[in-house]
Design a protein with these regions (language model features):
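C-terminal structural segments of small proteins and small subunits
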Residues: 54-81
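Helix N-cap motif at beta-to-alpha junctions
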Residues: 22-23, 62
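Amphipathic, hydrophobic secondary-structure cores in small proteins
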Residues: 27, 39-55
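Short, well-ordered beta-strand elements within core beta-sheets of diverse protein domains
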Residues: 13-21
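Short aromatic-glycine-(Arg/Gly/Cys) micro-motifs in beta-strand/loop hairpins
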Residues: 1-13
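Short arginine-rich
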Residues: 9, 34-44, 82
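Short amphipathic alpha-helix segments
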Residues: 25-33
Length: 82
């Protein structure tokens, strides 16, 4: 199974850091991820530090990364503000 572009596998999770243009843009990005996560009932770990958002996808019940996490990581990239 491949890792989506821009993501890395770390500690049984898919991880990516995003640097947004402002704090409000970072919060809007997180809101979009939250909408996606709620629609799929699969939720990432999120860390917000000013303009930087770190997203971690894993399936705790599976003990690591699943195909669902790979799909959600790829879909998260589509949430990025342009």
């Amino acid at each position: 199974m491949s890792v989506p572009e821009g993501w890395r596998e770390e500690d049984d999770a898919l991880v990516r850091e995003y640097e947004l243009e402002s704090f409000p843009a970072a919060i809007e990005f997180v809101r979009r991820i939250a909408d996606l996560a709620e629609s799929e009932n699969h939720h990432p770990d999120l860390d917000i530090r000013y303009r930087r958002v770190t997203v971690r996808w894993s399936t705790h019940s599976a003990g690591g990364v699943t195909e669902r996490d790979r799909d959600m990581a790829a879909r998260t990239s589509a949430c990025e503000l342009t």
